[in-house]
């Protein structure tokens, strides 16, 4: 019901009367979002889409007189298209255009607070998922992005023409700092480029952060001296406060470590952007772990797709980001995974619905983020990983290194031999997807470490249907 007063009509009216604008043509400066929405029974999809646009921009549940004090046409979000999701009942893709002025420059926190901060609890919707975002170039240029990017990292490491190799130290909790450093040294001297703190290693009673940093740096320097290669370990500086996080980052810089790590979702985008700026200013590479992501992105009809989180991380800043494996133990469907991997590291990506890319995205020469494939992978996966992810990636073997019967260093050697064999075969023109098994078996003849690893893991598979498919 509406009540008319002079120059103002109070009351409640349908959202679609104001926020559903199918005639609107999005501007180059608009931020575009695609939502998958499931309206409540009886709610028209156009009304639901308009409600999403309203509640994530300027609207509220009733008309307010202060609308007269601004230009709503300039600032409101607009639902400009609603289309059914193919093959699904009562699900719709809702496309919303947001004016650039709604967002603070250089703030992922503000963007997400606006777009997903409140509307996901809206009663008119049974479920809502943010599938994709198109960041306009005008907004992209207000962000620093990754501290350094893929090319600068390769130049610093002096490593080209192949993926990088890593390993997460296990057990993830319980080791003393000295034993932890020993495990790092064995992996690095065996042939890995990096080792890594797990996401929940911070500063616990069994291993305080400063002790870990010192023993790990000693291991890095010893392995570098023995191998003649640049090595690194992702020291996790995630902490309870930004001040403590930066203190740990400062100490890492002082002892000479090349790379640190942050849990960007549990730590938050404000903390992550702060750390990324510090890393740019102080010459540290920044590895990003996505701990907690599946809470947000795993359900197909509600939450936020990981491609959105990956795009936001590229803006916020990170040189590496975990991206799934396609072939390992963690969720990842090939075409969809490669869609957001390209969004992480390429400069320009065209719309391609078959890969889940709803908008063309131009990153305006912002440095790329290196995808990190980790979770349940071992030497038999190496040909597929090289073929799927290409050179600009980091292949992270945890159990696939430390589980070797002969120990950490032979496990690392097995992975390095498998990788080098696959790269040589690829460069010779062989088809790794078809001949990969033969390539690995041939390499076993001159690497006993690889032969033992292949025998141990020959039956290990993780074959479950992916939850998130299009």
Curated annotation (Swiss-Prot):
Keywords: Bacterial microcompartment, Calvin cycle, Carbon dioxide fixation, Carboxysome, Disulfide bond, Lyase, Magnesium, Metal-binding, Monooxygenase, Oxidoreductase, Photorespiration, Photosynthesis. Mg(2+) binds at residues 196, 198-199. Its EC number is 4.1.1.39. The modification N6-carboxylysine is found at residue 196. Substrate binds at residues 118, 168, 172, 290, 322, 374. Binds 1 Mg(2+) ion per subunit. It catalyses: 2 (2R)-3-phosphoglycerate + 2 H(+) = D-ribulose 1,5-bisphosphate + CO2 + H2O; D-ribulose 1,5-bisphosphate + O2 = 2-phosphoglycolate + (2R)-3-phosphoglycerate + 2 H(+). The active site is at residues 170, 289. RuBisCO catalyzes two reactions: the carboxylation of D-ribulose 1,5-bisphosphate, the primary event in carbon dioxide fixation, as well as the oxidative fragmentation of the pentose substrate in the photorespiration process. Both reactions occur simultaneously and in competition at the same active site. Heterohexadecamer of 8 large chains and 8 small chains; disulfide-linked. The disulfide link is formed within the large subunit homodimers. This is Ribulose bisphosphate carboxylase large chain. It comes from Prochlorothrix hollandica. The lineage of its organism: Bacteria, Bacillati, Cyanobacteriota, Cyanophyceae, Prochlorotrichales. The gene is cbbL.
């Amino acid at each position: 019901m509406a009540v008319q007063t002079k120059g103002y009509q109070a009351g409640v009216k349908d959202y679609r009367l104001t926020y559903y604008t199918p005639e609107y043509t999005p501007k180059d400066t608009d931020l575009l979002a695609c939502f998958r929405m499931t309206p409540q029974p009886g709610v028209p999809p156009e009304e639901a889409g308009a409600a999403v646009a309203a509640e994530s921009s300027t609207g509220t549940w009733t008309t307010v007189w202060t609308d007269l004090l601004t230009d709503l046409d300039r600032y409101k979000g607009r639902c400009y298209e609603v289309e059914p999701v193919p093959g699904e009942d009562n699900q719709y893709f809702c496309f919303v255009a947001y004016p650039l002025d709604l967002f603070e420059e250089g703030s992922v926190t503000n963007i997400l607070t606006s777009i997903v901060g409140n509307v996901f609890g809206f009663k008119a919707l049974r479920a809502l998922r943010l599938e994709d975002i198109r960041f306009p170039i005008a907004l992209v240029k207000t962000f620093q992005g990754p501290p350094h990017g893929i090319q600068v990292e390769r130049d610093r490491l002096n490593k080209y023409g192949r993926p990088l190799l890593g390993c997460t130290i296990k057990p993830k909790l319980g080791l003393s700092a000295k034993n932890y450093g020993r495990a790092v040294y064995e992996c690095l001297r065996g042939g890995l480029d990096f080792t890594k703190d797990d996401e929940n290693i911070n500063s616990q009673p069994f291993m305080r952060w400063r002790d870990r940093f010192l023993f790990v740096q000693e291991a890095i320097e010893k392995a570098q001296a023995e191998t003649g290669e640049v090595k690194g370990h992702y020291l996790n500086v995630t902490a309870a406060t930004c001040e403590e996080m930066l203190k740990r980052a400062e100490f890492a810089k002082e002892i000479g470590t090349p790379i640190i790590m942050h849990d960007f979702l549990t730590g938050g985008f404000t903390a992550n952007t702060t750390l990324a700026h510090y890393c740019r200013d102080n010459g540290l590479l920044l590895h990003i772990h996505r701990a907690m992501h599946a809470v947000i992105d795993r359900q197909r009809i509600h939450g936020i797709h990981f491609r959105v989180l990956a795009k936001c991380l590229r803006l916020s800043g990170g040189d590496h980001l975990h991206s799934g494996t396609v072939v390992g133990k963690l969720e990842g469907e090939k075409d969809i995974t490669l869609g957001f991997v390209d969004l992480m590291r390429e400069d320009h990506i065209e719309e391609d619905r078959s890969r889940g890319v709803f908008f063309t995205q131009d990153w305006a020469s912002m440095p790329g983020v290196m995808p990190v494939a980790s979770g349940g992978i071992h030497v038999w996966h190496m040909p597929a990983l090289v073929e799927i992810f290409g050179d600009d990636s980091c292949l992270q073997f945890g159990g696939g290194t430390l589980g070797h019967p002969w120990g950490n260093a032979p496990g690392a050697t097995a992975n390095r031999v498998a990788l080098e064999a696959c790269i040589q075969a690829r460069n010779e023109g062989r088809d790794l997807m078809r001949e990969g098994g033969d390539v690995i078996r041939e390499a076993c003849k001159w690497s006993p470490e690889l032969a033992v690893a292949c025998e141990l893991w020959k039956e290990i598979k993780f074959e479950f249907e992916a939850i998130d498919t299009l």
